[in-house]
Amino acid sequence: MDVSYLLDSLNDKQREAVAAPRSNLLVLAGAGSGKTRVLVHRIAWLMSVENCSPYSIMAVTFTNKAAAEMRHRIGQLMGTSQGGMWVGTFHGLAHRLLRAHHMDANLPQDFQILDSEDQLRLLKRLIKAMNLDEKQWPPRQAMWYINSQKDEGLRPHHIQSYGNPVEQTWQKVYQAYQEACDRAGLVDFAELLLRAHELWLNKPHILQHYRERFTNILVDEFQDTNNIQYAWIRLLAGDTGKVMIVGDDDQSIYGWRGAQVENIQRFLNDFPGAETIRLEQNYRSTSNILSAANALIENNNGRLGKKLWTDGADGEPISLYCAFNELDEARFVVNRIKTWQDNGGALAECAILYRSNAQSRVLEEALLQASMPYRIYGGMRFFERQEIKDALSYLRLIANRNDDAAFERVVNTPTRGIGDRTLDVVRQTSRDRQLTLWQACRELLQEKALAGRAASALQRFMELIDALAQETADMPLHVQTDRVIKDFGLRTMYEQEKGEKGQTRIENLEELVTATRQFSYNEEDEDLMPLQAFLSHAALEAGEGQADTWQDAVQLMTLHSAKGLEFPQVFIVGMEEGMFPSQMSLDEGGRLEEERRLAYVGVTRAMQKLTLTYAETRRLYGKEVYHRPSRFIGELPEECVEEVRLRATVSRPVSHQRMGTPMVENDSGYKLGQRVRHAKFGEGTIVNMEGSGEHSRLQVAFQGQGIKWLVAAYARLESV
């Protein structure tokens, strides 16, 4: 069989990875080095050359989008869809496993996935029920604590509190939360992985079945795995499974959410003899950008080591701009984008990256003032929007009456006269009798223990849920969804919310009906009812794609959101000490290297043009703050960077010049471009001027000292 098509389009190192013998393998894949292509071709190689059945292959990705792309590309390469292969995220595959073995995992058949918002809502209720002060014991912190323990594989009884009263309280919250979830048949995202891991540990025959089946395991973005994910893969592989991991220790930027870059080294230790192949040829960026990225990341210690290169052009130098303040910075970026557009470039080819979401406000205002469309990447996702979650909660309750989180969300949405006092009685009964909220309502209504008006409203609500579930059981999913939206008053409620916001909510509900109409079963969903399958899809998918793409628009996003993306022109703003690297990383040991990896990720997003900006002053939290330029700027090779020198007045509050008029010489006798010497900073060049008389100020770019603003009357500069 001719398999040259699997190798012909690859470079030497990519071929080596694709055609490697079936053994444990680490592919250290640099940014833009074609790792997805290598994974896809490797899977095709295993089936075509090694005669491996698709049934024996599990491929793990970190996003549903990446999983869908991998399935599509494998199908294109092989010419047919490959049934039996498991391709998905850790959470998606764990969910599939638990559905198949729900009884062995001690879960009801109709268990539901609890997303982070509903998890928070449940924890608020539990903390209140435990008579804990929400200010002292914040529900969001409880959620972080519980998820962190699960990521480490720990149940409440595993945690050693060592007499620490704070730890003991969190342990009790975790225990109460676990019991509430078990009663209602709810599983949060961290629970999916932990429960799947426990299933294999507690049921050796099930583990053995999957070990014998999945003899070829491939994992993408391995540097982003946490402890439970690593343990999951390690357990599945056993002593006979062949594991290929693809990762880049230089792009490990999720330590704050449990990712362990050390897992790559653990893999090499746990799988002795594993081969390492480095993909260093970059197909994205110019040579200048790659030289800067290499120099930057070399300042980190303990790297596995690789150096990106390209046989493409050197490209333009990296532009560096020192802004007077954040307003100047934003206007500079917008003007550069306008120039790009005037020269025939698309707005969507331009991305503005920032360390913190709070930085976007000024940028958004500048873009609005310039009438320049923009899109915030990673904004509110479709399935996370209020109106969508309301409709989904009704559907969840129809699918499973014991879903407490769904019950809490919709029992009085729209308002139907069921107040907090009534619900508190229901909640207390639920706790006292170890019942779900639905079961507690049933018993209280039978006992006539609730006030008349509230009891009637609750009775009508429950009867409507039961009736609609029965009436729509055999209807198509989209008809069922449309009935829920109309019969429960959601559409009417949002029609009463006047203006664009209400209209947007209605349009989103209509889009949900469209989504249910277009929903198609995956192989792993074939044993589920349509409603259960769609609810699982909605919880796992959570709309990973960005906003509508019909309009050409500038892309705004955090540096974390930018990972995996690429743009012809990239701006990284706020390159200042305390901003990027963040103050937290400077205050906490061990965090600085992850910040540098984040800078590396930002730099390697750029294909053709990269611009870095920093501001001398920045208004933060209502105060004017002075920052030094980021140390990351100083770590870039001088030959790769070019400082931008603009006309004198841009956004200086003390300027007497008309905005935009260039000041070539002022009454202090200095000129733009003049070489000068300062007693402390040495030699430099005047790159900007503002004001006149005693207010005259000069911006001087000093060799090795950066750019400084000086008052001309006191600077005592000597002409060189």
Regions found by a protein language model. Name each.
Residues P21, Q82-M85, H102-E191, F214, ...:
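ATP-hydrolysis module of ASCE/P-loop NTPase motor domains
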Residues D8-A19, S23-L28, V38, M58-A59, ...:
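Conserved helicase NTPase motor core
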Residues M1-L114, L120, Q208, E262, ...:
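P-loop NTPase Walker
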Residues M1, T240, A562-M579, M584-S585, ...:
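Structural signature of nuclease core domains in nucleic-acid processing machines
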Residues I159, G163, A346, S360-M372, ...:
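Conserved helicase C-terminal RecA-like lobe
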Residues D2-L7, L39, A44, N227-E329, ...:
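Conserved RecA-like helicase ATPase core segment
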Residues V3, L7-L10, R15-A29, Y55, ...:
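Inter-lobe coupling/hinge region of RecA-like P-loop helicase motors
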Residues S53-T63, M85, D220, V246, ...:
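Conserved RecA-like ASCE P-loop NTPase motor core of nucleic-acid helicases/translocases
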